[in-house]
Amino acid sequence: MRVLIKNGTVVNADGQAKQDLLIESGIVRQLGNNISPQLPYEEIDATGCYVFPGGVDVHTHFNIDVGIARSCDDFFTGTRAAACGGTTTIIDHMGFGPNGCRLRHQLEVYRGYAAHKAVIDYSFHGVIQHINHAILDEIPMIVEEGLSSFKLYLTYQYKLNDDEVLQALRRLHESGALTTVHPENDAAIASKRAEFIAAGLTAPRYHALSRPLECEAEAIARMINLAQIAGNAPLYIVHLSNGLGLDYLRLARANHQPVWVETCPQYLLLDERSYDTEDGMKFILSPPLRNVREQDKLWCGISDGAIDVVATDHCTFSMAQRLQISKGDFSRCPNGLPGVENRMQLLFSSGVMTGRITPERFVELTSAMPARLFGLWPQKGLLAPGSDGDVVIIDPRQSQQIQHRHLHDNADYSPWEGFTCQGAIVRTLSRGETIFCDGTFTGKAGRGRFLRRKPFVPPVL
């Protein structure tokens, strides 16, 4: 199968040019002017549009069981939504398994979840929910099987203490894996939460007040120091929500420490005032939404290169689940927001179209750097001969208002309802196959492939 994309502006992280792009058998074969491929081929006219590498979202939670509820997106509805939003690769954070389970247990469970449902290519992050000799011995074998990143939690039920974190950091570093971490100070959160509950203060706004930015920033600083103690182990901070944590990361980077950081559209575009609305429970996530000042600090990091990746942390619970389980108490509400379908459009509209970032920086944040950090480059995140034919075409002339009824996930609401975006996703191709076109999903469940990722190699800081 041959596909020729003509008349568009092809953009990679290192530059852009108005040129044609030829995909053959799912692989980019040629870029240039006036390409004349052998017949037969499909021709796509991208006049006036940007032709970007397909998005790489390295932070999703599909089919996750958090104990009190299971998220309402599985690997079909979740990857369908991703495809319709221009994302062609996801790396899903595996959920916790039974007490004492091995790493392989969760890998086998999640490969079963995705195998016949995923629309786009996928991989997983391992999750380390406890430390013992068996887990430490298992890590190199899992890396050899293509999982080269693992997540640690400093909060929630399976949080690790500092000694366990050090053991994990050392072993992951030795094994060629990147450590990712959810950084919040669990003890401080528990203390604040208990105070509010004892006082009968359980409305959504107290979720944010119980998890102040200092809880997140302290944990970031602690992880930076522990990574240094563990032999300068590489570290990736997920879902950054505040400027103080970013300051600590800037300092570490200035000291040539191998640390990277992601943020998410919700921390760039939503703020804590959402908790005081009638539907405040729909915005419960951790870390919580912050104020506009923190948004501005994050946008500075987006613009100046201090932030490396924009992912989603897509974790969908319906309003029915939230209301039934929480019964008006923020501490009982399942955490997470939908967003995998909106990431590319939101960042393009609020970043590129406002002049905050260039189209090249957009590629860096949404596909190139995620692919580099997580062992997928140059197969993903790049439009060049030999790379996968993963493409998203965005028309900057079109304006769209986000409405839940037009989205493709399995949620019953969107936190982005009513947002007007300048720029529309008009087509998504995965390995040369159109899976979304002009508002219509055309992919199929099970066509996505499991990606064996290479061991971690740090990009140049």
UniProtKB/Swiss-Prot annotation:
Optimum pH is 8-8.5. One of its GO terms (cellular component) is cytosol. It holds the Pfam family Amidohydro_1. Its EC number is 3.5.2.-. A divalent metal cation 1 binds at residues 59, 61, 151, 313. One of its GO terms (biological process) is pyrimidine nucleobase catabolic process. Carboxylation allows a single lysine to coordinate two divalent metal cations. SUPFAM superfamilies: Composite domain of metallo-dependent hydrolases, Metallo-dependent hydrolases. InterPro entries: Amidohydro-rel, D_phenylhydantoinase, Hydantoinase/dihydroPyrase, Metal-dep_hydrolase_composite, Metal_Hydrolase, Metallo-dep_Hydrolases_sf. Binds 2 divalent metal cations per subunit. Can use zinc, nickel, cobalt or manganese. Its cofactor is Zn(2+); Ni(2+); Co(2+); Mn(2+). The keyword Cytoplasm does not apply. The modification N6-carboxylysine is found at residue 151. Keywords: Hydrolase, Metal-binding. A divalent metal cation 2 binds at residues 151, 182, 239. Substrate binds at residues 156, 286, 335. NCBIfam families: D-hydantoinase. Belongs to the metallo-dependent hydrolases superfamily. Hydantoinase/dihydropyrimidinase family. Catalyzes the stereospecific hydrolysis of the cyclic amide bond of D-hydantoin derivatives with an aromatic side chains at the 5'-position. Has no activity on dihydropyrimidines. The physiological function is unknown. Homotetramer. This is D-phenylhydantoinase.
